A protein has these predicted regions:
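Extracytoplasmic/periplasmic substrate-recognition and gating elements
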Residues: 208-277
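A local structural motif
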Residues: 66-73, 145-148, 161-176, 189, ...
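Alpha-to-beta junction loops
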Residues: 1, 104, 187-196
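Short helix-initiation/N-cap motifs at beta->coil->alpha
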Residues: 77-81, 173-187
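Extracytoplasmic/periplasmic solute-binding protein
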Residues: 35-45, 50, 80-144, 190
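Glycine-centered hinge/linker elements that transmit conformational signals in sensory
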Residues: 83-87, 136-175, 222
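Hinge/lid segment of periplasmic solute-binding proteins
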Residues: 1-53, 60, 99-103, 216-222, ...
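C-terminal capping/gating helix-and-loop segments adjacent to ligand/active sites or protein-protein/ligand interfaces
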Residues: 235, 278, 283-284, 298-358
Length: 365
């Protein structure tokens, strides 16, 4: 197993090029590899994803109402449309509840900035501007670079402002710790909820008392206003298969044959999907071996449709806890009307350079 780009560089002399393997041919999203020195050094064996969880039943019901911004969920494929829909839903809560028999209070579940929730925004939403800037700069998408410009922080602001304005939560109380976005969504009070596929289990666990069911759940990308038409969900992993290039060719061939067996045989696919509960990014996982997780199903469909998964660029964050804490502090003040957006930019950009320097000084020691 190779966990990331740094590990691939460390073991570069020992990783066999997998670009001609059956494993690579079956991979549904070719971004789920680690490249090193013009070779495919490692290939993901499973992944997690996050994006905008949404209540499919309520959203489809809204689309059928008179005056709805869109007539189909499929029309929500960019930030501008998403914002118009969220704005409209949030302004018509009473009408929607009356017509659909729902108990909505908001379009978006609360964007809590307390320690138990702020990682969704200082980590997962912050991933979006990092990803697009790293992509522009041509650097490794998960290893990052020592300085950033904040090229896409206006997009970050647009999405964040939507989260806050189209929620019932008081912007001054987002760091109070009294909010529970999962519960709001689970009880059918919100249409949208930024989080990941790990939420499928708690949302569908009957012991939690939520009203949503598996049939209500789906996920769409965090449309960011940059490359919306090509964007998939945010997909990442630290679990990649690699093959030892120093082994004999006979052993290499046997290993490649075994890995292909794992992703094509009934026994191998059953072990991954049903026994281990993992989501595998291969076109062989269909039928009985397709993931039961509705959010992972959405990720797989977007991959199959040719959308590009957004890498987990937040993995490059230097001194992650300190950097995020400064971003959250500035974001909290801005949202409460007690600070300026420029302070968020400073925490994001200058904070990155400062923490990178500190982190690499520590590495040098």
């Amino acid at each position: 197993n190779v966990g990331n780009s740094s590990a691939a560089q460390t073991w570069n002399d020992y990783t066999y090029d997998l670009k001609d393997s059956e494993l690579y041919k079956h991979l549904t999203d070719k971004s789920l590899v680690i490249n090193s020195d013009d070779k495919v050094a490692a290939i993901a064996n499973c992944y997690e994803c996050y994006g905008l969880i949404y209540n499919k039943t309520i959203l489809e019901g809204y689309c059928g109402m008179d005056g709805a911004v869109v007539s189909s969920v499929d029309e929500i494929n960019n930030f501008d449309t998403l914002k118009k829909v969220a704005d409209d839903i949030n302004s018509r809560i009473d009408d929607i509840n009356k017509e659909l028999g729902t108990d909505l209070t908001e379009a978006f579940a609360s964007a809590g900035l307390d320690d138990g929730s702020s990682w969704r925004f200082a980590g997962h939403l912050a991933n979006m501007p990092l990803y697009y800037e790293f992509k522009d700069d041509g650097c490794d998408l998960t290893a990052g670079e020592e300085s950033i410009k904040g090229t896409y922080l206006d997009n970050f602001k647009n999405v964040w402002d939507m989260y806050v304005s189209d929620s019932a939560a008081d912007p001054k109380t987002l760091n109070s710790g009294a909010l529970n976005a999962e519960s709001e969504f689970g009880m059918g009070e919100a249409v949208f909820y930024q989080n990941g596929d790990w939420e499928f289990s708690p949302l569908t666990n009957e012991e939690n008392g939520y009203v949503v069911t598996a049939d209500d759940l789906s996920m769409m990308p965090i449309y960011f206003g940059v490359d919306d038409e090509n964007e998939g969900l945010c997909v990442g992993t630290e679990n990649y298969w690699a093959v030892n290039a120093k082994a004999s060719q006979e052993d290499i061939d046997a290993t490649l044959e075994f890995l292909n067996w794992v992703i094509t045989s009934d026994e191998g696919r059953d072990a991954i999907t049903n026994q281990m509960g993992l989501t595998a990014p291969y076109d062989t996982f269909t039928g009985d071996y397709e993931t039961k997780n509705a959010f992972a199903q959405a990720a797989n469909k977007l991959m199959t449709d040719g959308k590009t998964s957004v890498a987990w660029s937040f993995n490059a964050t230097p001194n992650v806890d300190d950097w995020r804490a400064d971003v959250v502090s500035a974001l909290t003040a801005y949202t409460a009307g007690e600070g300026e957006w420029d302070a968020v930019k400073t925490a994001f950009v200058d904070g990155w350079a400062n923490q990178w320097k500190i982190a690499h000084e520590d590495d040098a020691q």
